Structures are given as C-alpha cells and as structure tokens.
C-alpha cells in the first residue's frame, strides 16, 4: 500500500473591520471602530477663519487609509460617495476635494458608489491608469503582485484612461489590463461576482 499525505485545509476567516488612518503629518491612528468621516469631523483641530479665495490657494493635504491583511472597511467621503475597501488595500484622499474634480489614489481592491456630480468628476488614480466617473457603482482591483488590473462596472458609466488611450465601459462590463504588456480587454461579466 502506498501512503498518501493528507493536507488539512486551513480555515479562512471572514475579514473584520480593520483600518489605519495616516494623517497628513504622518501620525497613524487606528480607526477600525469609527467611521472615517466621524474621525475627520470630530478631531480637535483649531478652527481657522479664512476667505474662500484663501482656502483655494492652500496646498492639498492627504489622508491615507490602509487596510491590513484580513481586514475590510467601509467609509463615506465628504461628497457622499461610499467606498468598501478589501484586505491589503490603500486609498489616499484629500482633506477637501478640489472644486474642479474629486481625485483619489488607490491600490488593492475597492468597491465605489460615487455620488453624482456632473460638474465635478470623480477620478480614481491607479499606477496603470485613471478611471473617470460621473456617478456610478464599480469596483477596481489593482494589487501590486498581480498581473492584471480589473475594473468592473455595476451601473452608470466610467472611462478608463491609460496614456493616450481611453476606454468607456457600460454596465456589466469588465476591463482587464495586462500590466506586463499593456493590453486591455473588455468583456461582459456577472457583476454579482465582483
């Protein structure tokens, strides 16, 4: 008789609410038990009275939210957009959105429900391209150690920009970008899987 090794499957636990906020000054704060907006609006900062024109000339300050392995986190941005972040993901968000466009910078996997504002587009920046949104629901998966960037559109309309090329997606479509050769493909998918 030949002995066959038996491998026991490791139990994979569902993600738990874990998040670390890095403030513009570099201070790291565990925000696992609070919402991002509650933290930002309730933190004790001195109130400074300034004219709107003065505020527009201030440099943008960014907060970074990092989700460790095994974590997940949902947050609502100041514009009403809702983000659901998966394990090992990161997003950089300005303290206040610019009046011309709403820019965020991400890596990992995030599901976006963007508040509609046709005058101020929402731009998701990744290492390989940008996604321009007017008001929609979609996901982006862009882990550093994976060959493909994927963005899947649930509703609305998005445009993926890479260098000089722009690709528009319709609901139920997924764009896959091969990070090694730059090729993009678009196909219909079951969005419930994403």
Residue ranges of predicted features:
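A residue-level detector for the "anchor" residue at the start of short, highly conserved motifs
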Residues: 1-194
């Amino acid at each position: 008789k030949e002995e066959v090794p038996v491998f026991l499957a490791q139990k994979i636990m569902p993600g738990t609410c874990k998040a670390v906020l890095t403030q513009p000054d570099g201070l790291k704060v565990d925000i696992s038990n609070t919402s991002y907006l509650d933290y930002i609006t309730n933190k004790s900062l001195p109130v400074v009275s300034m004219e709107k024109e003065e505020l527009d000339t201030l440099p943008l300050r960014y907060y970074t939210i990092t989700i460790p392995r095994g974590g997940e986190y949902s947050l609502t941005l100041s514009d009403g957009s809702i983000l659901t972040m998966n394990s090992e993901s990161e997003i950089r968000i300005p303290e206040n959105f610019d009046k011309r466009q709403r820019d965020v910078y991400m890596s990992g996997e995030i599901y976006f429900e963007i508040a509609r504002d046709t005058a101020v587009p929402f731009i998701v920046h990744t290492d390989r391209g940008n996604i321009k949104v007017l008001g929609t629901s979609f996901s982006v998966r862009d882990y550093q150690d994976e060959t493909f960037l994927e963005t899947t559109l649930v509703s609305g309309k998005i445009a993926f920009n890479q260098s000089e090329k722009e690709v528009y997606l319709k609901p139920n479509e997924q764009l896959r970008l091969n990070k090694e050769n730059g090729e993009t493909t678009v196909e219909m998918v079951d969005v419930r899987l994403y």
